[in-house]
Design a protein with these regions (language model features):
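Conserved substrate/cofactor phosphate-moiety recognition/catalytic segment
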Residues: 88-134
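Glycine-rich phosphate-binding loop used to anchor ATP phosphates in small-molecule kinases
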Residues: 124-167, 562
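Conserved phosphate-donor/acceptor-positioning beta-strand/loop module used by diverse small-molecule
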Residues: 162-186
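Catalytic beta/alpha-barrel core
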Residues: 287-289, 309-318, 328-331, 351-357, ...
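Catalytic alpha/beta core domains of metabolic enzymes, predominantly
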Residues: 388-536
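Phosphate/diphosphate ligand-binding glycine-rich loop within oxidoreductases
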Residues: 536-672, 811
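Rossmann-fold NAD(P)-binding glycine/threonine-rich loop
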Residues: 623, 639, 773-854
Length: 873
C-alpha cells in the first residue's frame, strides 16, 4: 500500500515516506562532525529544567514578524500536534531541507535522547543537547525547515530558540487534546492538558506565530472536498487527509515570509482571489462568534453565501462568558481553533474583531493589547485595532502585525457631539491614518435618520482630505435606524448569518444589542437593488445546443440565495448572428460561450484577458460600460466595480475560466506527496480547446514538463508549438520567470508509444477526449497502463461527464489504492462556473450551493445535448 494511504495530520512517519521513495532525501545534518571538531562547552546549566509554565517564562523580547525570504522556519509544540507533517508540507512547498532535531541528536551522538540521558546522566545530556541544538541552528539558518522536539525546550534550549526567533520565524503549533491523545495513547487526556497548560507560556515566549492544527480524519472531510459522486470517486479520501492542512499552513507561511517561485501552485486562481476585498465596493463580512464557530452552532457553508469576508468576533470581557472562565490558555485555544475552523472551511479572507466593551473594564486575566497580539500571531488577513488604546500600546501592536491589514476601529458608545459633521470623527480618521492603519472604522449609535446621509458627506470630506490615497473608510450608524447606513457602507459591512442559530443571537460580553449586525447579506443585497444602486441583469449561455446545460440551474439558484434579481438562460444558435444583438442589450450582464464559438468570438472582443490571449479561446464575455474602466483595463478592480449596472455597452471583454476550473481540480486532487516540483510531469490527452486550457492550467501551476498526446499527431504538435512559442516570447502571464527557461510542451507520437525513458511518469493527467466520435461511436478511451506508473500516484481529471463513468474512470478506479485521485467533469463544471460567477457579478460564488445544484439536476438524459459541445480529438 502507498505510504500516504492512512496518514492523518500528526501521524509520525519518515520524510522518505512522505516525499515518495524516488525523491531526494534532505542532506544529513553535520552536527556530529561539528561536535567532533569542537569540544562541548561546560558552561551551560547542568540541571535539566522541564518546561513547566510560568516558572520558566523567559525574559520578554520584542516579537519579530518580518524576515528574509530564505530564513529557516522552525516549528515547535508539545508532542502529537503534527509538527513533522507540517514540516514536510513546508519543506515540499518551499523546496527546502527538512531537518528534525531528534534525528540530528541521534546522528551526532549515536543514540536517542532517552538512551543518551540514561547512559551519561542528566548533566551530560544537558551539555550535549545544548551544543547539538546550537550547532543545528547555526548550520541550518537558511533555506531549511527545522522540526524541534518538545525536549529541545529543556534547560538552555528555550533561550536558544527564543533568541533564534529574533531573526527567524518560529511557529508554535497547537492542537486539541483529543487529537493529541489519538497520537500519544499512553498519556491520558488529563495529563496532556496539564502538559499543555504548563508549557504554553514558554512555547509562546519562544515563538512569534501560532498555528492551530485541526484534527481531521478521512471521515471528517467536508462535502465540498470529499467524494460527491459515489460511482466515480469512492476511494479518494485516504490520500487527501493532509491536503487541507497543507492549504491552511501554507496560507500562514505566505503571511509570514511571502511567496516563492512555485507559490502559484498553492494559490487560488479565481479572479476575486487576486483582489484585496477592501478595494471592492459594497462588500460584506458575516459576523460569527468564536463560541458559535467552535460549537458548530453555525452552518459555515450557509453563513458564507453572499458575503466577501468572515468576521470572527472575540469577546474581551473576562468577567462574563465561558470564553474567559478558564483563563488565557482556554481563550487562546478557543480563538485559535475558531480561526482554524474558518480557515479550513472558506477561501474568504478572515477579519478578527475584538468585541467592543462599553465599560472598558481593565482586564484582570488578559489585557486587550495581549489579546490583539495573539490574534496577529495567527496571521489573519485583517484584524481590528481599538484606537482608544494608549499610543505606546498602539505603536507596539502595529509593529507586530506582519502582513495582516489593520482596521483602526473607534466604536462610539454614545452619539458624538456634532455627529458625523464635527471634527471628532475626522480626528479619529487622521489618528488611524497617522498610525499606518490600512482601513479606518468609525461607528456610533443612530441619532436620527439624517445621520444616514451625513455619513455620505463625511466620506466625501475624507476623500477630499487625502485625494483618495489614504486608508479606506468604514462608517455607519448602529441600531435599527442605522440599518440604512449599514446597507450603503462601502466596505466590509458586518452582517448577520442567514440562518438563525438554535438559540437567539445575543451580544458578546460588553456589547449592547444595538451593536449587533441587524441585516443579513441577502437583505443588504436586496436593499441595494431596491434603491437602484444595483440593477437586474440578464445572463446567458450561448452555443450550438445548450438547452441541456446545467449552468442556468447553478447561477439562478445562486442569484436567488444572494438576493440578486438576475436571470440566466440558454440560447442555442448555429451562428453568431443572435449573439451580436444580445450582447448590446442594456441589461446584458455576461455570457458563457461553448462550442463551436470559443474561437469564433475572439475577433468580436474589444479587449481580451491575458489568459484568453494565451489559450487562444474564450468561454466568458462581459460587457464594459465605463470609459474609465476601458481605458485602464489592466486594473481588474474596475471590471468588478461596474458589475450589476445597466446601460449602453461600449466594449466587450473576453476571458477564459476553463483553465481555472481544470487548475482547481488538479490542485484539489494533487496529494502533498505529489506537490509540484521541477521534475514533476503533466500529461494532456487531446488537442482541442479544452486541451489548450489544460496546458495553460499546468503551466500556471509551475509544471515544467508537459506532454500532449492526440490521435492526430499533427494537432498535438501544433498545440505544443503554440505554447513553446509563447514561452520563448514570455507571452504567458501565469508562467513564473524562473520557470520559463525549463518549461516545455512536448507532443507524444501516439497513445501506443512508450513513455519517454528520461522523464518521470506523470502525476497530473487531464483527458479532454470526448466519449463519442462525430458519428456517434464510443471512443472507449483509456491510457496505457505503463503511463500511470508514478510510484506516488497522482491526479486524473476526466472532463467528460456523459456518461459520468467512462472507461478512463474505471481504469483509474482500479488503481486508486496506489495513490491515484480521480476528478471528473462534474468537479470541473462548477469550478469554472465559480470563476464566471465572480466575473459576472463581482461577488464570490456560493460554492456548496452551486455544487449541490449540479448533482440535483444531473442525469445522463438531461445532458444528452452536452455531447454536441465537447471538443473534437
Amino acid at each position: 500500500m502507498n505510504t500516504m494511504t492512512a496518514v492523518h495530520a500528526g501521524m509520525k512517519r519518515s520524510y522518505r515516506d512522505m516525499r515518495g521513495a524516488d525523491s531526494m532525501m534532505s542532506p544529513r545534518s553535520n552536527t556530529k562532525e561539528v561536535l567532533q571538531q569542537r569540544p562541548i562547552s561546560r558552561e551551560t546549566s547542568a540541571t535539566p529544567t522541564p518546561p513547566n509554565g510560568a516558572a520558566n517564562r523567559l525574559e520578554p523580547r520584542p516579537r519579530k514578524v518580518m524576515f528574509n525570504f530564505d530564513a529557516t522556519i522552525l516549528i515547535i509544540g508539545v508532542r502529537g500536534v503534527g509538527k513533522s507533517s507540517l514540516g514536510f508540507l513546508a519543506a515540499s512547498a518551499y523546496s527546502r531541507r527538512l531537518v528534525e532535531s531528534d534525528r540530528a541528536f541521534s546522528e551526532a551522538t549515536g543514540s536517542s535522547r532517552t538512551a543518551y540521558r540514561k547512559l551519561h546522566g542528566p548533566a551530560e545530556y544537558q551539555h550535549t543537547h545544548y551544543e547539538v541544538l546550537k550547532r543545528l541552528l547555526e548550520t541550518n539558518s537558511k533555506n531549511s525547515v527545522i522540526v524541534c522536539s518538545f525536549a529541545d525546550l529543556e534547560g538552555e534550549g528555550a533561550k536558544l530558540i527564543r533568541d533564534w526567533a529574533q531573526s527567524h520565524p518560529v511557529i508554535y503549533v497547537r492542537r486539541d487534546v483529543a487529537g493529541i491523545h489519538d497520537y500519544i495513547r499512553i498519556w491520558s487526556e488529563e495529563r496532556i492538558q496539564d502538559v499543555i497548560r504548563a508549557s504554553e507560556g514558554l512555547l509562546q515566549d519562544c515563538s512569534n506565530y501560532d498555528f492551530y492544527n485541526v484534527s481531521e480524519t478521512i471521515d471528517s472531510l467536508s462535502p465540498n472536498e470529499g467524494p460527491r459522486h459515489p460511482s466515480s470517486r469512492a476511494s479518494n479520501g485516504p490520500f487527501l487527509t493532509l491536503k487541507r492542512t497543507e492549504h491552511d499552513f501554507l496560507k500562514l507561511l505566505r503571511n509570514i515570509i511571502g511567496d516563492h517561485d512555485r507559490g502559484r501552485s498553492h494559490q487560488s486562481a479565481y479572479p476575486l482571489s487576486q483582489m484585496s476585498v477592501d478595494k471592492l465596493e459594497f462588500t460584506s463580512a458575516v459576523t460569527l462568534s468564536a463560541e458559535d464557530v467552535v460549537s458548530r452552532r453555525i452552518d459555515l457553508d450557509e453563513a458564507q453565501i453572499g458575503v466577501d469576508a468572515i468576521q470572527l468576533e472575540v469577546n474581551i470581557n473576562p468577567a462574563q462568558g465561558d470564553t474567559w472562565r478558564l483563563g488565557k490558555h482556554s481563550c487562546f485555544n478557543l480563538i485559535g481553533e475558531a480561526f482554524a475552523l474558518l480557515r479550513r472551511s472558506t477561501i474568504l479572507p478572515i477579519v478578527i474583531d475584538i468585541a467592543h466593551d462599553a465599560r472598558d473594564a481593565r482586564q484582570k486575566q488578559l489585557s486587550r493589547a495581549e489579546l490583539l497580539e495573539y490574534c496577529f500571531r495567527l496571521g489573519p488577513e485583517y484584524c481590528t485595532l481599538d484606537l482608544t488604546l494608549d499610543e505606546a500600546q498602539l505603536t507596539h501592536l502595529l509593529g507586530g502585525k506582519g502582513r495582516t491589514r489593520v482596521i483602526g476601529q473607534y466604536i462610539a458608545d454614545q452619539r458624538i457631539s456634532d455627529g458625523w459633521s464635527g471634527q471628532a470623527c475626522m480626528d479619529v480618521y487622521e489618528k488611524a491614518s497617522g498610525l499606518g492603519c490600512e482601513l479606518v472604522k468609525i461607528t456610533m449609535p443612530d441619532g436620527n435618520l439624517t445621520d444616514n446621509f451625513a455619513i455620505q458627506a463625511f466620506q466625501q470630506r475624507v476623500q477630499t482630505l487625502n485625494d483618495g490615497k489614504g486608508p479606506r473608510l468604514i462608517a455607519y450608524c448602529t441600531g435599527r435606524q442605522g440599518r440604512t447606513s449599514m446597507c450603503f457602507n462601502n466596505i466590509l459591512t458586518p452582517v448577520a448569518p442567514p440562518v438563525a442559530v438554535p438559540e437567539p443571537m445575543t451580544p458578546a460580553s460588553g456589547q449592547s444589542l444595538e451593536q449587533l449586525p441587524l441585516v443579513t447579506a441577502k437583505e443588504r443585497s436586496q436593499a441595494l437593488f431596491a434603491s437602484f444602486v444595483h440593477e437586474p441583469m440578464h445572463f446567458l449561455i450561448y452555443g450550438a445546443n445548450v438547452s441541456f446545460s446545467l449552468s442556468p440551474a447553478m447561477h439562478n439558484a445562486a442569484y436567488e440565495a444572494m438576493g440578486m434579481p438576475h436571470s440566466y438562460r440558454t440560447h442555442s444558435a448555429s451562428t453568431l448572428e443572435d449573439f451580436v444583438t444580445l450582447v448590446r442589450e442594456h441589461d446584458f450582464g455576461g455570457a458563457a460561450i461553448v462550442q463551436p464559438f470559443k474561437t469564433r468570438t475572439l475577433p468580436m472582443m474589444d479587449l481580451l484577458s491575458p489568459h484568453a490571449k494565451a489559450i487562444g479561446a474564450l468561454n466568458t464575455v462581459i460587457p464594459l460600460r465605463d470609459e474609465g474602466v476601458i481605458a485602464s483595463i489592466s486594473s481588474d478592480v474596475g471590471i468588478f466595480r461596474e458589475r450589476n449596472r445597466t446601460g449602453p455597452v461600449k466594449a466587450l471583454y473576453g476571458d477564459n475560466t476553463d483553465w481555472i476550473g481544470i487548475r482547481a481540480c488538479i490542485r484539489r486532487g494533487l496529494s502533498p506527496a505529489n506537490t509540484v516540483r521541477p521534475q514533476s510531469t503533466g500529461l494532456v490527452c487531446g488537442a482541442g480547446g479544452m486541451a489548450r486550457a489544460a496546458i495553460y492550467a499546468m503551466i500556471s501551476l509551475g509544471v515544467q514538463n508537459i506532454f500532449v498526446c492526440n490521435r492526430t499527431k499533427g494537432n498535438a504538435e501544433e498545440l505544443a508549438e503554440h505554447y513553446n512559442r509563447l514561452i520563448r516570447a514570455n507571452g504567458i502571464a501565469e508562467l513564473s520567470p524562473s520557470n520559463a527557461a525549463n518549461t516545455t510542451v512536448t507532443a507524444l507520437d501516439s497513445f501506443q508509444a512508450e513513455w519517454p525513458k528520461n522523464m518521470r511518469h506523470p502525476t497530473m493527467v487531464v483527458s479532454t477526449i470526448p466519449t463519442q466520435t462525430l458519428d456517434g461511436m464510443p471512443t472507449n478511451f483509456t491510457l496505457p497502463k505503463e503511463w500511470l506508473g508514478s510510484r506516488t500516484g497522482g491526479v486524473v481529471v476526466e472532463l467528460a461527464y456523459m456518461p459520468i463513468v467512462t472507461p478512463l474512470v474505471v481504469q483509474v478506479q482500479q488503481i486508486q489504492s496506489k495513490g491515484w485521485i480521480l476528478m471528473d467533469g462534474l468537479d470541473m463544471l462548477p469550478e469554472q462556473a465559480f470563476a464566471q460567477f465572480e466575473l459576472f457579478t463581482g461577488r464570490r460564488a456560493p460554492r456548496k450551493l452551486m455544487r449541490d445544484e449540479v448533482f440535483k439536476h444531473y442525469s445522463e438524459d438531461f445532458l444528452l445535448g452536452a455531447a454536441l459541445n465537447t471538443d473534437s480529438p
